[in-house]
Amino acid sequence: FIMPQNNGQIPGILYCIRCCVPETQEGVSFDEMGVCTACRSSEEKMHINWQAREEQLQKILNDAKQKAGDGYDCVLPISGGKDSFFQAHVLVKVYGLKPLAVTFSHNWFSETGFYNLQRCLEVFNLDHIQFTPARGTVNKLARKSIGAIGDSCWHCHSGVGAFPLQIATKFKIPLLVWGESIAENDGRATYQCPV
């Protein structure tokens, strides 16, 4: 299932016939039809009992509220993008949670990105902790990681994963709510078989 036309793709590399993700994407695999796991996982959404999932979520959130007492119910990693706004809306307005918003700043925020983050905090009245590594450190890490693993923002990915967990542990916050689906992101998991 090597795509016959170039379309800006590198010849000899396998691509998903639906979304064009290359085989070089970490964790990706393809079925016999040439469709990646992430695309197959996306199909699973049509067959999920969403009412049962809602009940599971409600139980998890209620348990977190009970454990938190008067403290924060959950840690909410946010960047200020559309996903952050949606997560904050659902947690605060739909479920009535009191999240602590956290941001690992890669130190490359655009003016618009910074504004959006501040707006999200204001709209949902969120307390917020942000960690911003020194610009010199960020630049060193970017240079080293682009050479070592081909990703100049490796420190971003690591920080976005580690910082919220550190905050949840430090402040004994019982729940961490992420805003992306690993089932659709890179195919290492599915909706039926999570990581």
Q: Each PLM stretch: what is its role?
A:
Residues 4-195:
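ATP-dependent adenylation/nucleotidyltransferase module used to activate substrates
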